């Protein structure tokens, strides 16, 4: 039940859901809980002002309901001016839900970078 709940929470398309189920099915409930705890602890620890020395592109699924990801991404964009693009028809795993748009956004971003 935990694997299905996680897969449902972070995906929007059937393909992404099945992909997430396959990825998570290798873990026990205890391992999943440990990984989630470690991930959140690391996020809280790393959620600070950063001085990033390379170009940044922020991508977030328009249907991302994981925690406050959309809020954080919007605030990050407002505070830094980094470009933020919403991925249509995608949840937290936007690169699987809508890989075509994700790839297009990355390609356009990298092509526009100065040489």
Give the positions of each predicted feature.
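Conserved alpha/beta-hydrolase catalytic His-Asp/Glu region
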Residues: 1-51
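Post-His helix in hydrolase/transferase enzymes
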Residues: 96-110
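Conserved loop-alpha-helix segment in the C-terminal half of the alpha/beta-hydrolase fold
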Residues: 55-90, 96
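Hydrophobic alpha-helical packing elements
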Residues: 32-35, 72, 102
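Alpha/beta-hydrolase-fold serine-hydrolase catalytic core, especially in secreted/extracellular enzymes
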Residues: 114-115
